[in-house]
Regions:
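Alpha/beta enzyme core
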Residues: 1-147
């Protein structure tokens, strides 16, 4: 933040990736891009958060806010609705949910188009109920067409 402001970029908004969990829900994306072959790092758990720990996310968000972040993203979203809720309540900042490829694949795996549409909307509404100000989702084209 300080460097941006020193260079006359006061209007730049910083979105923190403070709460990125070492989740199995990233699997479909990693498989699609063959991430294991491209990366020397085989275990993302060395630098992503423990999936059982929500307090670490609050600590990391607080640090990023002290460093000038304006908003935060929680990734993946659905398994961490509690983290979205806590971040919004504790810090009162714009909070975003990222619905990752595994969440997308899981919802699409349910048979029947009508059922899928209901599940997609229910998942999006759950982010809003948890306090998300914005949602990044592979379902965005569907949502733009149907909402």
């Amino acid at each position: 933040r300080n460097e941006l402001e020193k260079n006359g970029m006061q209007d730049i908004v910083i979105m923190s990736y403070a709460a990125k969990y070492a989740s199995s829900f990233y699997g479909p994306f990693r498989d699609a891009i063959k991430a294991q072959k491209l990366s020397q790092i085989k275990d993302k758990k060395t630098y992503q958060m423990n999936t059982a720990n929500s307090d670490e996310a609050m600590h990391e968000i607080a640090l990023d806010l002290q460093e000038g972040a304006d908003m935060v993203i929680i990734k993946p979203g659905m398994p961490y609705l509690d983290v979205i809720y806590r971040a919004k309540k504790e810090f009162q900042i714009p909070t975003f949910a990222y619905q990752v490829s595994g969440e997308y694949s899981m919802l699409l795996s349910v048979a029947g188009e009508k059922r899928n549409q209901e599940l997609i909307l229910e998942s999006i509404f759950s982010f809003k109920r948890a306090g998300a100000d914005g949602i990044l989702s592979y379902f965005t084209p569907f949502l733009l067409k149907n909402l």
